[in-house]
Amino acid sequence: MAKIVVIGAGVAGLTTALQLLRKGHEVTIVSEFTPGDLSIGYTSPWAGANWLTFYDGGKLADYDAVSYPILRELARSSPEAGIRLISQRSHVLKRDLPKLEVAMSAICQRNPWFKNTVDSFEIIEDRSRIVHDDVAYLVEFRSVCIHTGVYLNWLMSQCLSLGATVVKRRVNHIKDANLLHSSGSRPDVIVNCSGLFARFLGGVEDKKMYPIRGQVVLVRNSLPFMASFSSTPEKENEDEALYIMTRFDGTSIIGGCFQPNNWSSEPDPSLTHRILSRALDRFPELTKDGPLDIVRECVGHRPGREGGPRVELEKIPGVGFVVHNYGAAGAGYQSSYGMADEAVSYVERALTRPNL
């Protein structure tokens, strides 16, 4: 089979590598960072993560649709992957109804595209089941919560078990990957899963890439479900949100914010205060067994891209075939298998049509 170099060992790179390995290809993963590293340059460990699609349809929704049943099955059959099946409750505030009628995110719709994709989908309007007076209705369904540190290690272990090799180094130019396949031979295809670094990677330098700063708090407190809200109480903080992701180990991720073009890597104490205050105001039961037990404040840079993610085949002069798979913004985990499968299809196209 073909010799492939995958640049990047985040969720996109590892998922794509895994799908290529399952087809019998010889894969070398090249990355400055690998699971276990905690660097602001390595986005994937800082994510929540869950399956909570916010696209209204089209290709981006298709990526999420492909990933849902795979993640659900992993939660059921492979507990070592760190994925938990758990209910997701999206709270739609009464005050947001007018604007939602104009621009309604999929997670707040009464009749979203994914209602027949997920398990146990339900619109809850019965006031006896809605705790908060300012909530118009709930969108509830069976979702997954991914412990990202555990899952990234699981992905890497799966890749290694199928024969992948790993080269831990920074790639400064896309052409350098031609010298890095473990066989010593030039790879047939390079797969670029460099995430936000695609902005700086020589030979790519995608200036459409930009950071979307996120800040969350990891705590040893939990709810029996996951939660999100259509907006926060303060009108002046429109780039902030309230969401709680409940992991299998009893910890929770409480967030957060979506701050485009913010490269800051340091936690903002005032934002941490707002995040926790909102969570406790909405869910005082978080502290039923004791006060909030904070593990750490986390900051990450989601790989945003103008026009959406890039999944495509390119033939670069002097380099060869490159398949790009990056720029999923905040949807990296929930879109991972859909985007990886499309990337694999482009690899196969390059292999079968070398004169493109």
Curated annotation (Swiss-Prot):
Activity regulation remarks: Inhibited by benzoate and hypochlorite.
Q: Name one GO cellular component term.
A: peroxisomal matrix
User: Which residues does (R)-lactate bind?
Assistant: Y243, R302
Q: What is the effect of changing R220D?
A: Alters substrate specificity and decreases the stability of the enzyme
Q: Does the keyword Aminoacyl-tRNA synthetase apply?
A: no
Keywords of the record: FAD, Flavoprotein, Glycoprotein, Oxidoreductase, Peroxisome, Signal
Q: List the disulfide bonds.
A: none
- What Enzyme Commission number(s) does the record list for this chain? 1.4.3.3
Name the Gene3D superfamilies for this protein. Answer: D-Amino Acid Oxidase, subunit A, domain 2, NAD(P)-binding Rossmann-like Domain
Residues involved in anthranilate 2 binding: F54
Result of altering F54 to A/S/Y: Increases activity on cephalosporin C (CPC). The enzyme becomes more resistant to thermal inactivation
Q: List positions binding anthranilate 1.
A: Y243, R302
Signal sequence, start to end? 1-17
Where, per UniProt, does this protein localize? Peroxisome matrix
- One of this protein's Pfam families, by short name? DAO
Effect on the protein of changing R220A = Alters substrate specificity and decreases the stability of the enzyme
Write down the glycosylated positions: N192, N262
Its GO biological process annotations read: D-amino acid catabolic process; nitrogen utilization
Q: Practical use of this protein? A: Capable of converting cephalosporin C (CPC) into 7-beta-(5-carboxy-5-oxopentanamido)-cephalosporinic acid, an initial material of different beta-lactam antibiotics. Has been used to resolve racemic mixtures of D,L-amino acids to yield enantiomerically pure isomers for pharmacological and peptide research uses.
What the protein does comes down to: Catalyzes the oxidative deamination of D-amino acids with broad substrate specificity. Enables the organism to utilize D-amino acids as a source of nutrients.
Q: Which PANTHER family match?
A: D-AMINO ACID OXIDASE, D-AMINO ACID OXIDASE (AFU_ORTHOLOGUE AFUA_5G11290)
Family according to the record: Belongs to the DAMOX/DASOX family.
User: Which protein is depicted?
Assistant: D-amino-acid oxidase
